[in-house]
Amino acid sequence: MNDQDYTQDSGIGAVGWMRSVVIDAHDPVLLAQFWCNVLDVEIVESEADWVQLSPDPGGTFFAFQPSTAPRPESLVARPDIEVTDIDHARDRIIELGGSYVRTIQELKGDHHYVMADPEGNEMCLVQPLPPELARPRWGDQAI
């Protein structure tokens, strides 16, 4: 099935599918390099107005475009990055030039970390979902 067929009528009620997350950046190359290290992916396209990474294991592309617009006071979205060792991942983000923002305590005693990339874009480091809630990873089986 090609992209056009999927977005016209997938049979599952979807309007479309998540192809990429595009982030405005004052320095797109710097942020692309940071996220390459976070997600263990590579830059696959680099133009004056666009830097795109290879897809992560979930199949989503991150891309960065230049922007001189002021940063909004409140973020309306941030990615959740699933990790197996949350404390190691927090430390690694800091080593790569990111920063720790805060810890969020969850209802069942777990926690996750809100982190920021070098330009202040927030992300959450989260622990894996329990098997009954997790969906198959890209490539493991049909989604």
Task: Please provide the spans of the model-predicted regions.
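Conserved short beta-strand elements that form part of the metal-binding/catalytic scaffold
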Residues: 39-75, 118, 122-129
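Vicinal oxygen chelate
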Residues: 2-26, 52-53, 60, 63-64, 68-92, 94-143, ...
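Intrinsically disordered, low-complexity regions enriched in Ser/Pro/Gly/Gln/His and often acidic
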Residues: 10, 27-28, 43, 131
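Intrinsically disordered, low-complexity acidic/polar segments
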Residues: 32, 73, 88-90, 124, ...
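Short linear motifs in intrinsically disordered
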Residues: 39-45, 82, 101-106
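Amphipathic alpha-helical segments
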Residues: 27-42, 89-95
